Amino acid sequence: MIVTTTPNIEGKRIVRYCGVIAGEAILGANIFKDLSAGIRDIVGGRSGTYERELEKARAIALEELQQHAVALGANAVVGIDLDYETFGKANGMLMVSVSGTAVVVE
């Protein structure tokens, strides 16, 4: 399945719009506790542990998005937008959300 941030796909023609779809993943507070305990992971101002968890959450959100697209009969998703939001007590939760338009391309 093609998933892209662009509104169209070069060399492909959109023949049907199936609808707006979304996928989400939420990281619980325990990841932030683990991160503060694992400060030694930080190299050059970056935390490898945190980045790996974000990558996992992003992959989960994108997989959920694609599952919704397939359920609508789409073979591509265009115009995707990834967002990251913190919430909860002391911003202890992180949500990764992705949305886009499910389409059929030829």
Curated annotation (Swiss-Prot):
InterPro entries attached to this UniProt entry: UPF0145_dom_sf, UPF0145_YbjQ-like
Similarity comment text for this entry: Belongs to the UPF0145 family.
Protein name (Swiss-Prot/TrEMBL): UPF0145 protein VC_A0951
HAMAP family: UPF0145
Pfam entry (one): YbjQ_1
Entry-linked SUPFAM superfamilies: YbjQ-like
Source organism per UniProt: Vibrio cholerae serotype O1 (strain ATCC 39315 / El Tor Inaba N16961)
